[in-house]
Design a protein with these regions (language model features):
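Short coil/turn motif common to extracellular beta-sandwich-like domains
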Residues: 286-289, 310-316
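Terminal amphipathic alpha-helical/low-complexity segments used for targeting or macromolecular assembly
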Residues: 1-6, 11-12, 17-18, 54, ...
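Short, solvent-exposed loop/edge segments of extracellular or virion-exposed proteins
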Residues: 291-306, 336
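Conserved "repeat-terminator" motif of extracellular CCP/Sushi domains
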Residues: 286-293, 341-358
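Extracellular/surface recognition and adhesion modules
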Residues: 292, 298-300, 317, 327-330, ...
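Surface-exposed loops/turns
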Residues: 11, 311, 323, 345-347
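Surface-exposed interfaces of beta-sheet-rich extracellular modules
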Residues: 313-340
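Structural signal for interior beta-strand "rungs" in well-ordered beta-sheet cores
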Residues: 2-189
Length: 358
């Protein structure tokens, strides 16, 4: 581990092997950094934030600070980041909110360039390139292999399909179809321009798939298709009824049908937002739990148990050490006998679980 003397790592933060933390960086008490993560000087990681192995956080990037949502009331929410992601200078990523599911997720091997912003409750896939100053509003879903051009801005609840390419300075207010390129048009509009052939070739798609997608694009978006008076939903359904149907074209058509037939303002997730059943499923339920601070490398599992008189809930805490570590005790007291790694406590207590290297 390489920890600069001016860096601040709060008590309770969990750091993997060969983690590097630069000068004046800050790592909060509830942060988990996987093996080989590099936090460069003046970077900040706060909140209940987890980074997978091999991530890099560049100067002045800020991850895990409270979401910019007036409905947020300080509830415990999380930011979950996969492996081998790069967050360049001044990138900001916020955790989820209680009304939006409680978690913001980012997959693996994404590149977020200078000044990009990922708002609360976003779900970002893997292997995406998010260029300088791209702005994702809350609840945006981005599938895998998406390429976002610089200064593009994405409206709340938009879904961006896999292998899509969004041109620079594009205003994205509706779902973006997979495999296609959209660019800024006149005024504040954006429009579908072509199939992302170059991106598909780079990611291993064959000529047959690309040709089928180009044919589908012509049937859906060409000037002749738009001028023949047939509604876009009918054009999509005609393609879906074609047999045999290329799997990539089928994925494209099903994505479009969700947006046009079931979406609201061109955004499928917006329609779910209006559905009371889905809204309830998004809302984060408040769960009582014992506040536990972990020192060293290990985890504490909690389960609810009934009290002797049945008048209040108690919690069983079970300590599980990571390989190469051993549980040492609760609140600084050695765990002897070994059964003490599992105890029952009142939820009003604040516990410290200590793990020591073997």
């Amino acid at each position: 581990m390489n920890l600069h003397p001016t860096a601040i790592v709060e008590h309770g933060a969990q750091l993997g092997r060969e983690v590097s933390i630069g000068a004046y960086a800050y790592v909060g008490a509830n942060v988990v950094l996987g093996d080989g993560c590099r936090v460069l000087h003046h970077a900040t990681i706060e909140g209940h934030t987890t980074l997978g192995e091999g991530c890099e956080v560049f100067p002045y990037a800020v991850l895990g600070t409270p979401p910019q949502d007036v409905k947020f009331r300080g509830e415990r929410t999380t930011l979950e980041i996969g492996a081998n992601n790069i967050f360049r200078e001044m990138v900001t990523v916020h955790p989820g909110t209680g009304n939006g599911g409680g978690v913001t997720r980012i997959g693996d091997r994404n590149l977020l360039l200078i000044g990009a912003h990922v708002a609360h409750d976003c779900q970002i896939g893997s292997r995406c390139i998010i260029a300088n100053y791209v702005q994702f509003a809350g609840h945006v879903h981005v599938e895998d292999f998406v390429n976002m051009g610089g200064h593009s801005a994405v409206h709340h609840f938009v879904t961006i399909g896999k292998h899509a390419f969004v041109g620079g300075m594009t205003r994205v207010a509706a779902d973006v179809p997979p495999f296609l390129v959209i660019v800024a048009a006149r005024g504040t509009r954006s429009e579908v321009r072509m199939v992302n052939g170059v991106g598909l070739e780079r990611n291993g798609y064959g000529r047959e798939d690309i040709a089928a997608l180009k044919s589908a694009y012509m049937a859906l978006y060409s000037r002749r298709a738009r001028q023949n008076g047939i509604p876009i939903r009918d054009r999509i359904q005609t393609l879906l009824n074609t047999r045999p149907l290329n799997p990539q074209v089928e994925y494209l058509c099903e994505f479009l049908m969700r947006s046009f037939a079931h979406g609201r303002n061109g955004r499928y997730l917006e329609s779910l937002r209006q559905d009371p059943v889905h809204r309830k499923s998004w809302k984060l339920e408040e769960k009582a739990e014992v506040p536990v601070q972990v020192v060293g490398h290990g985890k504490v599992h909690q389960s609810r148990v009934d009290g002797n008189d049945g008048s209040r809930d108690l919690f069983r805490l079970t300590a599980r050490a990571e390989p190469g570590w051993a549980f040492a005790g609760w609140n600084g007291n050695p765990g002897d006998p070994p059964e003490a790694d599992s105890i029952v406590v009142d939820p009003t207590r604040q516990m410290i679980a200590t793990f020591k290297p073997l």
